[in-house]
Amino acid sequence: MSFTLLDGGLSTAIESLGESLNSSLWTGELLRRDPEKIRDAHQLYVDAGAKILISSSYQISFMGCKRVGWSEEDVHSALLLSTELARFSGIKVAASVGPYGAALADGSEYRGNYKVTFDGLKDFHRRRLEILVDSKPDYFAIETIPELREAQAILEVITEIGSEIPYWISFSCSSKQTISSGELFSDAVKIVSQSKGAMAVGINCTAPHLIIPLLSDVKSHLPFIVYPNSGRIWDPETKTWQGSDNDALSSFEIKKWVSLGATIIGGCCSIGPKEIAQLKPRSLD
């Protein structure tokens, strides 16, 4: 039942260090204010046994950062720094590429159906992807993607800029068959599986009880990557997670996920270093 252990939610680890995150840039805000806190949070996951770390660039985009007064130079520097902060000996770094909805800071990454053109989506992703290529990560973590159109836009940009960095695309999902936009997860898997350079396709920031039906419904030559949250629901109005996560791993049916093709497993929101440490022995079975 062996699998590669991914880290958990970066914000969860940072909050465990006593930091309050209420900026629209979330963990990305610390890239300017206190980058060592990000480094310390990554260290918690290394100590917990994670073999892949996802960088702090999820919220960093030219559009989103401009809204809070960052210069273009600030954005460029932050993107490069985010990868550097996640470098540890023997650990792989996945540069996070968050969705367009993350820059809107209104929970759109859990809905999709953005009011933006296809070319607008490509322009949004192109500049930061070009910079992240220069940061030389091991992988791209293209994550929490809520709609097929955005996945297609990113795939076109990757081809156009000539990136050869392996990547995964993981989708936020809303039901046993659909991603957040209401489109079929099976169609999402098909799009990624047909693309050049993809190393995995999967699911993140999704309730863990949905993972088995989602994976059971699809076939792919690519391995699956799975990193659900604890099952709590994000409230964009209060910017808080609603519900209990007293036993965050109770719905993590790891053995079944692996049998369905998952080879990389970790956690997302509200899954912290403690939970990743609990998963480590299971990754070695």
Language-model region placement:
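Domain-level signal for soluble alpha/beta catalytic cores
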Residues: M1-D285
